[in-house]
Amino acid sequence: MEGVIGAIHSPWMVPEDAGLAEPPRNYAAPEDAGDCKRKLEETRKAIRPYQRKLYAGRQFGLLLIFQALDAAGKDGAIREVFEDLDPVNVRVSAFKRPTKRELRHDFLWRTSRELPERGEISVFNRSYYEEVLTVRVHPQNLQAQYAGDAPDPESLWPARYRAIREHERHLATAGTLILKFWLNVSPGRQAQRFLDRLDDPAKRWKFSLGDIRESTFRTDYDEAVRHMLNETSRPWAPWFCIPADDRWYLRWQVADILRQAMAALPLEYPEPDELP
């Protein structure tokens, strides 16, 4: 899978040896929104033939992971990128606060149940990366994950990064192509979107005081993101940090990265069975 990933040309890919001193802050979107919509539509059409070959050949699985702060546009990006694709082999899993049952397992267990079969595209709306983001910002959440005392955070985070790297390397070796997207929204645009939710009756249900409280931890989240990117972006499972202030630009970029990745896979239709 490393050769496939190497074929993707994106300014947003985080190299393995990035050594980021701070989180990426590429907020500007240079394209016109109408132009981005048109390019998104063209890109979705270009993905369809690869999707059919993926499903028919069942040689590879695709795992797309979306992580972001609140109001960055994960839901919209997932909806728009996959809108015109055949739903037969696309499955979206949204991971919320862990249940009591999930907390009785290791932190990779609940997402492992939703991994793609060969021929399938699995989309994770949040993922096990919450365990090195939200939980790192709020380490008191660790108490619910352990029967006894929670591990020392200074030793826990390196152990979790290592577990994630080994998990993703195993998946890649077994034929899963992994693409991870950090949707990078600016504080100002995030605040504006919170206000927009209050103004729009169709979006008001999305508004949460909890989201407002979380936004006050922005500096802590930026630090956690920096560590996450540095520790877990690898050739077989790279991170793409995409500007999220412009929704249509974001969606087009995600679709184009997916298109490039699928185009680089050696997808083939299976040979028909011989007649007796």
Please state what every model-predicted region is.
Residues 1-276:
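Flexible, compositionally biased loop and terminal segments
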